[in-house]
Regions:
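Intrinsically disordered, low-complexity N-terminal extensions of AAA+/P-loop NTPases
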Residues: 1-157
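Interdomain "pre-motor" coupling segment immediately N-terminal to P-loop NTPase/helicase cores
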Residues: 135-198
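N-terminal pre-Walker A segment at the start of P-loop NTPase domains
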Residues: 199-227
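Walker A/P-loop nucleotide-binding motif
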Residues: 233-252
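AAA+/P-loop NTPase substrate/partner-engagement loops
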Residues: 258-291, 299-303
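Conserved catalytic/switch belt of AAA+ P-loop NTPases
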Residues: 302-351
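Conserved AAA+ ATPase "SRH/arginine-finger" region at the nucleotide-binding site
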Residues: 348-363, 370-382
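C-terminal alpha-helical "lid" subdomain
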Residues: 372, 376-438
Length: 438
């Protein structure tokens, strides 16, 4: 194994601390026969445990060794994988080196562990190659990554030669990209002593636009702007504003489920992180994806100045915002920044003779969102339609008049008519029906 790993060139930066790197070192020690057997076994078990932990996090199954090697290929960001992500299969000398590396990986895929297992009296590798994972709820592992790793792993295992292996890997890079950005739909920002990083959000909401009852014109505006963005045409930053509980956030979250396979990714950012926006944009501006930077429930009080960071990023900075980035925000306020009568009064505004400029600065933020979509509370008839549609989806077998009568009681006690209120009511009703059936 150590001789195979030493031949890696483009993928040779796995690091000595990687599982594959550690195992290669142990195999080299084993051939030297100077290291005590129990030390070698302990070293192997340490790496097998790491592999099992990784398999648990990503829901690997059947052949964990091949799953792990596939995961390495899918996440290793090197000059070849990053360029292939952008332009697809390359036609150049670099292919020679890539195919050589893939020949190594194909040999590792089918590596015979029986000799070392017999010599050390272990069977851990055989067990890893025929593994049956315990069922886990999808919220406990990264299902999206798991499905892609296992699907590609099976194809690579069946590849008859390095040429086919090469085509399968490059096709994956072109379709899904490379690294955690390629594998995951959504991310949050994490700031630390070593800078700003993106942390995958493993369990995203499964909502689709069709799940949001009503608001057809609003969804169509959002869909049209997003599809133009994905097609490389001109598109605008979008502000979804209006009443609480009307589906603004759900509409934006649905986009990554609708368009993930077309290269859409989402980065969620909070108000206190706006100063990190420039760093985040620098990280993703050259990647072959379209990123929506999502700001939920956006608003500012009069003494908050974070909106200045946002304005600089949206428009007006020295560096032009990359074409692969848009900002989508939701807010209960159309103007985003709280405006007081003090802003309009000459004498009460610290003698600011240019008070209209001060006012304009505050109001200009919402104007920088080229698409502004209003989500207002439904009327009574629309609320009834939402309730009955959700009840049908839930499979509730109650008469319509009973459902609507209970819905009216519920909304009077829970904040009025809205899509959120309707969903909360249906959740409650479904729970009581389950208790009754039991």
């Amino acid at each position: 194994m150590d001789q195979l790993v030493s031949r890696l060139l483009l993928y040779g930066d796995l690091g000595e601390e990687s599982i594959l790197g550690k195992l290669a070192g142990i195999f080299q020690e084993w051939k030297g026969s100077a290291t005590p057997r129990q030390v070698l076994v302990r070293g192997i078990y340490d790496q097998v445990k790491r592999l099992l932990d990784l398999a648990t996090d990503y829901g690997f199954d059947e052949d964990l060794w091949q799953n792990y090697l596939t995961f390495l290929l899918m996440t290793n960001e090197n000059s070849f994988s990053l360029i292939t992500e952008r332009v697809g299969e390359l036609d150049g000398t670099v292919n020679h080196f890539a195919k050589s590396d893939f020949g190594v990986f194909r040999a590792l895929f089918h590596y015979d562990f029986s000799v070392i297992e017999r010599d050390l009296g272990i069977d851990c590798f055989t067990t890893l190659r025929h593994y049956k994972a315990i069922y886990k709820h999808e919220r406990r592992y990264n299902k999206n990554v798991s499905e892609k790793v296992r699907a590609l792993s099976q194809k690579l295992a069946a590849a008859p030669d390095e040429e086919r292996f090469f085509h399968l890997v490059t096709e994956h890079y072109k379709q899904y990209g490379v690294g955690l950005i390629g594998l995951n739909k959504a991310f949050r920002i994490q700031s630390g002593p070593h800078g700003v990083g993106l942390i995958p959000i493993y369990n995203t909401d499964k909502v689709m636009l069709k799940d949001l009852v009503g608001y057809e014109s609003q969804k169509e505006q959002l869909r049209a702007n997003t599809e133009a963005f994905l097609a490389g045409r001109s598109a605008n930053n979008a502000l979804l504003y209006g009443d609480a509980g009307t589906g603004k956030s759900s509409s934006v979250k649905a986009l990554i489920n609708e368009y993930y396979d077309q290269g859409l990714r989402m980065i969620e950012i909070y108000k206190h992180q706006f100063r990190d926006l420039s760093a985040v944009i620098a990280m993703v501006k050259n990647r072959n994806y379209r990123f929506i930077i999502f700001i939920d429930d956006l608003s500012f009080e009069e003494n908050e100045v974070e909106y200045k960071f946002l304005k600089a990023v949206i428009e007006g900075g020295v560096e032009t915002k990359p074409d692969n980035i848009l900002l989508y925000a939701t807010s209960n306020r159309r103007n985003l920044i709280r405006e007081t009568w003090k802003d309009r009064a000459d004498m009460e505004h610290d003698n600011d003779v240019h008070h209209s400029d001060t006012l304009e600065e505050k109001l200009s933020l919402s104007a920088r969102f080229g698409v502004r979509i209003n989500y207002s509370i439904p009327n009574r008839n629309q609320f009834k339609d939402i309730v009955l549609t959700l009840a049908k989806r839930q499979g509730l077998m109650l008469p319509e008049e009973v459902i609507l009568a209970e819905a009216n009681k519920w909304e009077l006690r829970h904040g009025g008519v809205s899509g959120r209120t309707a969903q909360q009511f249906i959740n409650y009703l479904a729970g009581t029906q389950t208790e009754t059936n039991e």
